[in-house]
């Protein structure tokens, strides 16, 4: 007796559906391969290089250290980066597993509410995690970019001593935000005895001034070159730097000796040794 088509469809509907391997997590959101959490079976707790950035493993059971900015990452067994960080490859092409570097997803330095500059907002957040939250005015980002500060002389000019006709120079290195304007001045005295600042190079044909940025960000290096050196060039030279926040100065001295005071050494003739 042939089966009725309606009966066949009814039997098909009543058949249990096979489990489909869709790789979905269970209703609880856990990895299907994870068993019951047993903390006693977790690896012994390790002291994380950077405390405060810890997460749970994929099963939500054992604690894992997260990589801070600049830490190695990537690979199957490599470290995971902390919040706000991404694992970037160190090489332009293909690189071995575990050779990535944790970098901040938001590039650029920031100014913190504590008046300090941080290389990235991730570095500021890490500092904020480590700072006591009970203190008033908890650390936060004040603005993008480094904090402003008045010029600071990093390398002051060194005093020089030379003879007339020689070539000498003085240099100084200054750091500030915004980047400072650096000038050279010669400290002189008026006939009345008051101090006078003479801007250089002025009318001096043997003096040149050069200023360039660097060697690091928000730094400036300035030189004053004297060639040829004359007796009237002797004196005190000031390296002056200024920006919208403040100013700073440092001094170097040039001492000049007349070349005519030095005589060429006379070596004894062969006959003089007899």
From Swiss-Prot:
Subcellular location, record wording: Secreted
Domain IGFBP N-terminal: 30-105
Residues of this chain annotated as glycosylated in UniProt: 162
Domain Ig-like C2-type: 151-255
Example GO BP: regulation of signal transduction
Gene Ontology CC: collagen-containing extracellular matrix; extracellular space
Entry keyword annotation includes Nucleus: no
SUPFAM superfamilies: Growth factor receptor domain (SSF57184), Immunoglobulin (SSF48726), Kazal-type serine protease inhibitors (SSF100895)
Cystine bridges: 34-59, 37-61, 42-62, 48-65, 73-87, 81-102, 111-147, 172-239
Coiled coil: none
Chain's role: IGF-binding proteins prolong the half-life of IGFs and have been shown to either inhibit or stimulate the growth promoting effects of the IGFs in cell culture. They alter the interaction of IGFs with their cell surface receptors.
UniProt protein name: Insulin-like growth factor-binding protein-like 1
Organism: Bos taurus
Higher taxonomy: Eukaryota, Metazoa, Chordata, Craniata, Vertebrata
Gene name per UniProt: IGFBPL1
């Amino acid at each position: 007796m042939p089966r009725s088509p309606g009966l066949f469809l009814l039997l098909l509907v009543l058949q249990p559906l096979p489990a489909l391997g869709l790789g979905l997590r269970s209703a609880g959101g856990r990895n299907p391969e994870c068993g019951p959490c047993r903390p006693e079976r977790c690896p012994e707790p390790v002291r994380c290089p950077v405390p405060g950035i810890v997460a749970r493993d994929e099963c939500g059971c054992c604690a894992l250290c997260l990589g801070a900015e600049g830490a190695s990452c990537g690979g199957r067994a490599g470290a995971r980066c902390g919040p706000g960080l991404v694992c970037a490859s160190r090489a332009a092409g293909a690189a071995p597993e575990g050779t990535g570097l944790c970098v901040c997803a938001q590039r650029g330095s920031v100014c913190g509410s504590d008046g300090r500059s941080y290389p990235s907002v991730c570095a500021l957040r890490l500092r904020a995690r480590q700072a006591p939250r009970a203190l008033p005015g908890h650390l936060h980002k004040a603005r993008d970019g480094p904090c402003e500060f008045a010029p600071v002389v990093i390398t002051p000019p060194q005093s020089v001593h030379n003879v007339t006709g020689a070539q000498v120079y003085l240099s100084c290195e200054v750091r500030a935000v915004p980047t400072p304007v650096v000038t050279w001045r010669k400290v002189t005295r008026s006939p009345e005895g008051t101090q006078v600042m003479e801007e250089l190079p002025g009318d001096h044909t043997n003096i040149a001034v050069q200023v360039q940025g660097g060697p690091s960000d928000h730094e400036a290096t300035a030189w004053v070159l004297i060639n040829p050196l004359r007796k009237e060039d002797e004196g005190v030279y000031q390296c002056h730097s200024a920006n919208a926040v403040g100013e700073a100065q440092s001094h170097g001295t040039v001492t000049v000796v007349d070349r005519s005071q030095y005589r060429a050494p006379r070596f004894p003739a062969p006959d003089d040794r007899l």
